[in-house]
C-alpha cells in the first residue's frame, strides 16, 4: 500500500504548481465536478495567493481561484494547520472575490456566484460528518417556507433560490474520513487523506491526476 501511495503527488502541491496549467485543467475540473455536483468547465485561473516553491515545503496554506464557463468564481483552499478566525478569513476571501470581479458602473446582475471549498487537515470543531455545506436561504419566520426570488432574464421571469445567488461554502474535514471509498466523492476524499488512487477509479479527475 505504501508503494501505491508514493506514486502520487500531494493535491496541494498539484494545485500550487501543476493545475494552474491549462493542459492539466481536467484534474481540477474533475475535482470540482464531484464536489459541486454538476459538470464544471474551467476557462481561466485567476490571480491567487501562495508562494511556496518546493514540494516538501512545510507550508500552511495554498489556494487556487478559477472561473468556470458560467462565469462563477470558485475558490479552492487547502489549510494544513489550525488558524485563529479561520471562518472569518474564508468569509473575507469570498467577499473580496465578489468585489474584485465586478467593475464600477456594472449592474448588480454582474455579481458572480462564488463557491468556496476548504480542504482542512486540522480539527475545526465538533461534528459527525466529514463534509459540511453552508448555503444562504431565507426561511419564513412564521410559515417556515423558503423564499424563491423572481428575476427577469431576456424578457423571461426566472425563479431562483437565494442559494443559487449567495456563496456556497464547503468544509472538507479530511481527517474525519474513515470509510471504504465507493463513490467518486469518497474516492476523492480518500486521495486527499491518503494519497491513494484506486487503479479502477471512475471518479472524474482522479485518473488524470495519476498521470500529472
Identify the meaning behind each predicted range:
Residues 1-212:
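Elongated, amphipathic alpha-helical interaction scaffolds
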Amino acid at each position: 500500500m505504501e508503494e501505491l501511495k508514493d506514486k502520487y503527488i500531494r493535491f496541494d502541491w498539484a494545485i500550487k504548481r501543476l493545475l494552474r496549467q491549462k493542459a492539466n485543467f481536467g484534474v481540477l475540473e474533475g475535482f470540482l465536478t464531484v464536489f459541486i455536483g454538476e459538470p464544471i468547465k474551467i476557462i481561466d485561473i485567476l490571480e491567487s495567493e501562495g508562494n511556496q516553491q518546493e514540494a516538501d515545503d512545510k507550508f500552511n496554506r495554498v489556494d487556487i481561484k478559477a472561473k468556470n464557463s458560467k462565469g462563477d468564481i470558485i475558490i479552492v483552499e487547502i489549510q494544513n494547520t489550525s488558524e485563529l478566525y479561520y471562518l472569518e478569513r474564508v468569509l473575507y476571501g469570498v467577499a473580496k472575490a465578489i468585489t474584485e470581479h465586478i467593475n464600477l458602473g456594472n449592474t448588480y446582475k454582474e455579481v458572480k456566484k462564488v463557491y468556496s471549498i476548504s480542504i482542512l487537515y486540522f480539527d475545526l470543531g465538533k461534528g459527525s460528518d466529514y463534509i459540511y455545506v453552508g448555503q444562504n436561504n431565507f426561511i419564513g419566520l412564521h410559515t417556515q417556507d423558503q423564499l424563491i426570488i423572481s428575476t427577469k432574464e431576456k424578457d423571461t421571469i426566472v425563479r431562483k433560490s437565494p442559494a443559487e445567488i449567495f456563496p456556497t461554502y464547503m468544509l472538507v474535514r479530511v481527517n474525519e474520513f474513515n470509510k471504504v471509498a465507493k463513490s467518486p466523492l469518497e474516492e476523492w476524499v480518500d486521495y486527499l487523506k491518503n494519497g491513494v488512487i484506486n487503479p479502477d477509479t471512475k471518479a472524474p479527475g482522479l485518473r488524470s491526476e495519476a498521470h500529472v
